[in-house]
Design a protein with these regions (language model features):
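Peri-catalytic and regulatory segments of divalent metal-dependent proteins
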Residues: 2-136, 153-156, 168-205
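Intrinsically disordered, low-complexity segments enriched in small/polar residues
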Residues: 134-139, 144
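Short, conserved phosphate-binding/catalytic loop or strand-edge motifs used
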Residues: 142-151, 191-193
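Short-chain dehydrogenase/reductase
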Residues: 157, 161
């Protein structure tokens, strides 16, 4: 039988392989937004949040995607993505911190790995900019399109409502611990809801 340390090492290796494979596909299919100042800003806020998590088994990395639609998502092993579209909807650093906190917690709690163990039917990688059909929920992940994908044979599925709610609550708490205003979360959620509703309306015309 494997001991705890061996199991943890296997889990970390799985996270890293899924994250690296997903990063390559995202870079190829979507592309990164080449704005050094914007990238530094997002990374600065992200690392400020990560510093409040304590010691971590991997390095968190933050990327700005060249995508006009509002979106944010995370891959295992600390790969966090935000689109230039969602950055355009954030009015303050506090709002960005709440969005990043949400995605960081998906990684920290290994939600992708947990979800992939539920025998979800795999699908071809979908560009995360595709807006989800329902915006009735109140979590970030229920408003913007979390990616349902398969990377190198490993399933990455959409998160459950329980995982989304947990990421919202813990992500906001993480933002508060880093000195950010928790009231930014409902503000940015409302703005995202309105924007996605507008996009869906345009797509139906």
């Amino acid at each position: 039988f494997l001991n705890i340390n061996q199991l943890q090492a296997q889990n970390l290796k799985l996270d890293q392989s899924m994250g690296q494979a997903g990063l390559l596909q995202v870079q190829q299919m979507i592309g990164l937004y080449e704005d050094e100042n914007l990238q530094k800003y997002v990374s600065k806020v992200g690392q400020r949040l990560v510093s409040k998590l304590g010691e971590q088994p991997f390095q968190y990395r933050f990327y700005v995607l060249d995508m006009a639609e509002p979106n944010a998502f995370a891959l295992p092993a600390g790969y966090i993505f935000v689109s230039r579209g969602i950055l355009a909807l954030t009015n303050t650093e506090d709002e960005l911190a709440c969005i990043l906190g949400h995605e960081i917690m998906h990684v920290h709690k290994r939600h992708s790995i947990q979800q992939s163990k539920k025998s979800v039917i795999p699908s071809i990688l979908q560009i995360p900019g595709a807006v989800v059909g329902s915006v009735a929920g109140e979590t970030i992940g229920n408003i913007i399109g979390a990616p349902a994908s398969i990377t190198s044979g490993l399933i990455l599925s959409s998160y459950s409502r329980v995982h989304e709610t947990e990421a919202d609550e813990l992500g906001t708490a993480l933002a508060v611990s880093a000195g950010y205003n928790p009231k930014a979360m409902p503000a940015v959620l409302n703005r995202l809801h309105n924007e996605v509703t507008f996009i869906e309306g345009k797509n139906m015309e």
